[in-house]
């Protein structure tokens, strides 16, 4: 009994969840504005640039762990509202994060694996630092990686379909940038560039299906927010049995 009460009254860190996005964004901003000068220090500069990017991803993982700890005592989770985002007529969208078992699981996977990739890339990208006399490539790679982590975090934690779409677009952009990163390396570079373009076109096809489904759901439920849709789903199913089939495709 004492253990159950202790768990149920455990610490809550839900209010920290926006930092899963803020930390990677801070990391990429640091390297955008300061990374060029830091790389002038040579190999030591590489370690700083890569280390800052890795630290940003690692701190995002720490926040994800804290969300998992919070769920132990509060399994119902929470929706954390950061700010009002879009208000058009009856449409009122907030920039909010959904903290539940599924989203936290994905946060842990994305930030955990992403941090390991960042650390590995510090050494892996060493030979690419001075490629074609462009030392900025090393910095750009880690900027793209931090941006990818931030976009993925929005994708897996957003509380509405429009935030999900923003994350989806960000991940698509980063995929294009990273797949085609070595676009100038001879025949291999041509293959990289073509693969990047193919990924971009494929994602744009996905955009059409995504938006079609999202606006069909909005037409059916009158909202883009996940928790509101889940609450209304049983009522809509009873009132119009065919509505959910149409909304779900």
Give the residues covered by each predicted segment.
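...captures the hydrophobic TM-helix bundle architecture rather than a specific catalytic motif
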Residues: 1-249
